[in-house]
Curated annotation (Swiss-Prot):
Molecular function terms, GO-annotated: peptidyl-prolyl cis-trans isomerase activity; protein folding chaperone; ribosome binding
Entry's EC annotation: 5.2.1.8
Taxonomic lineage: Bacteria, Bacillati, Bacillota, Bacilli, Lactobacillales
Pfam name, any one: FKBP_C
Residues covered by the PPIase FKBP-type domain: 163-248
Domain of life: Bacteria
Cysteine disulfide partners in this protein: none
Tagged with keyword DNA-binding: no
Full protein name: Trigger factor
Length: 445
């Protein structure tokens, strides 16, 4: 095969290639076998006409279109490989010549991946992450866990405050008419939780059990039920009970009740400190990685990202997101109904930073090439094993879903990320230095 690539624009060009005579003959033979099945010729049973008779009656030209459709995919793929280009979209095919007895000449207009000129990607300076866990942090976590273990106790004759839970009946009306979803009985509502329409909870503060309260509110303009959005409503509300949170005492008994692995409050604090430290170290690692990758991407030069790549990235993200929803038993249709959104809304959501994601991927791929990263078969096997475990799939199913090239691509990108991240240097920002000096000065007084 003879293939020639001629660049026409930043990311576009023309790929000219030939389909040689032996290939053409094979294509014509296959096309004939397809056509003859439904062909009726006088003197022959349906589908039984010979190749010689067909050629005499219709000529090979009658098979050219079918033969080209048969041959084109493999011929184009071979031409792409020979020319070394990396297409990102379906080509526009134009037949240059299909003369009898000569190779067919095909011209394809192709959009390819843009060229990436790497800047610095090793030894990048990124903001230092604070992973220190203070006594204040531990106390805040303890308080959160006390809140989770709190009991709601009924308090007669107590005026409701934010943080209290009221048990209520309510009937909502708009212009004197009840509406769907506007009524409930024995509903438990935590005041200050902002779980009801803005203004509703505030009007129950200060009232006691047995009180009947008329609550007047206006539905937000962006309320998910469009028929209620922006409308004024009145809720006849009866308070049955006012409940107050009673927090458990912060002592050894609380610690043992909360965690079977500890016997004292001090042991619980030590365990919480380790948990918070582990969380912050993981978050710090992710933050360093994100900052280093962003800087490496910013340091690189890419003239223009093809729209086809951006659109493909959007669809990939949508497919992945909706696929995760389906694994949780939520179909795309159900998801759109539950969220009050549409496919267009989801498309816009992922479109917002699609170009940035594409640029990042291009830079990482360029680093893979620059570092001559070539994943081994053992690494591929390990990747398959990890994916099978993560998605609860059989390893054979993973290999069927992902080609060897795709697996090696993903492994290579991960190794490129490690190169960027492992060589990055964490440095104190000017603000961090100033804060530290102020803290040290305060401690010296």
């Amino acid at each position: 095969m003879s293939a020639k690539w001629e660049k026409k624009g930043t990311n576009d060009g023309e790929l000219t290639f030939e389909i040689d005579l032996p290939q053409i003959q094979q294509g014509l033979d296959q096309a004939f076998q397809r056509v003859r099945k439904n062909l009726t010729v006088p003197g022959f049973r349906k589908g039984k006409v010979s190749r010689t008779v067909f050629k005499r009656m219709y000529g090979d030209a009658a098979l050219y279109e079918d033969a080209l459709n048969i041959l084109l995919p493999d011929a184009y793929e071979a031409a792409v490989k020979e020319s070394g280009i990396d297409p990102v979209d379906q080509p526009q095919i134009n037949v240059d010549s299909m003369d009898e007895g000569k190779p067919w000449v095909i011209k394809a207009t192709v959009t390819v991946k843009p060229e990436v000129t790497l800047g610095q990607y090793k030894g990048l300076e990124v903001p230092k992450q604070n992973v220190e866990v203070s006594a204040k942090d531990i106390d805040a976590e303890l308080e959160k866990r006390r809140e989770q273990q709190a009991e709601l106790v009924v308090k007669d004759d107590k005026a409701a405050e934010n943080g209290d839970t009221v048990v209520i009946d309510y009937v909502g009306t708009i212009d004197g008419t009840e509406f769907d979803g506007g009524s409930s009985k024995n509903y438990s509502l935590e005041l200050g939780s902002n779980s009801f329409i803005p203004g509703f909870e505030e009007q129950l503060v200060g009232h006691k059990s047995g009180d009947e309260v008329t609550v007047n509110v206006t539905f937000p303009e962006d309320y998910k039920a469009a028929d209620l959005a922006g409308k004024a409503a009145e809720f006849k509300t009866t308070i049955h009970e006012v409940k107050v949170k009673e927090l458990p005492a912060l002592d050894d008994d609380f610690a043992k009740d909360l965690d079977d692995d500890v016997d004292t409050l001090d042991e619980l604090k030590a365990k919480i400190k380790k948990e918070l430290t582990d969380q912050r170290e993981e978050a710090a690692k992710n933050a360093v990685q994100e900052a280093a990758i962003k800087e490496a991407t910013d340091n690189a030069t890419i003239k223009e990202v093809p729209n086809a790549m951006i659109e493909q990235e959007v669809h990939n993200q949508m497919d992945q997101y909706l696929g995760n929803m389906q694994r949780q038993g939520i179909s795309p249709k159900m998801y759109y109904q539950l969220t009050g959104t549409s496919e267009d809304d989801l498309h816009k959501q992922f479109e917002a930073d699609a170009a940035t994601r594409v640029r990042t991927n291009l830079v990482l791929e360029a680093i893979v090439k620059a570092e001559d990263i070539q994943p081994t078969e053992d690494q591929v096997n390990e990747e398959v094993k990890n994916l099978a475990s993560e998605y609860n799939m059989d390893e054979k199913a993973v290999r069927k879903a992902l080609s060897e090239d795709m697996l090696k691509h993903d492994i290579g990108v991960k190794q490129a990320i490690d190169i960027i991240t492992d060589s990055a240097k964490e440095v104190e920002s000017a603000k961090d230095d100033a804060d530290k000096e102020a803290s040290d000065a305060k401690a010296d007084k």
